[in-house]
């Protein structure tokens, strides 16, 4: 906090130097990133730190960017990447998820298809199962069977809609 508020940084004791602090450059700024507190493994920020920060919630990427990211991270075809992104965005749009799916879900599905050499058009049942398993897991933190079954049903409908 001292480097943000007072523009000094405390140095560890025992460095053998006379000065116990370092002046911070007057133009010093910092960018902090964090996940929402409801994510597993995230700890609440200290109030003193939060008082000195501006929080900017970021929205999801646009459709084209999600397709490009999915394709780049998986090396799948553009058509397959578009289909995966459409399914994930369709699920997100329903608003029925505890946590909306992100581009990470797209990447996980795409990489699974690539590694397993699965063609969604020829293996629709396997493709549907992969999408259901990944998206039910990504959108729920409590693991409620009822919620996961509902998500899997929605995903099945979306796969039927977009896998042609």
Map each language-model feature to its residues.
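C-terminal regulatory/interaction module of P-loop NTP-utilizing enzymes
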Residues: 1-164
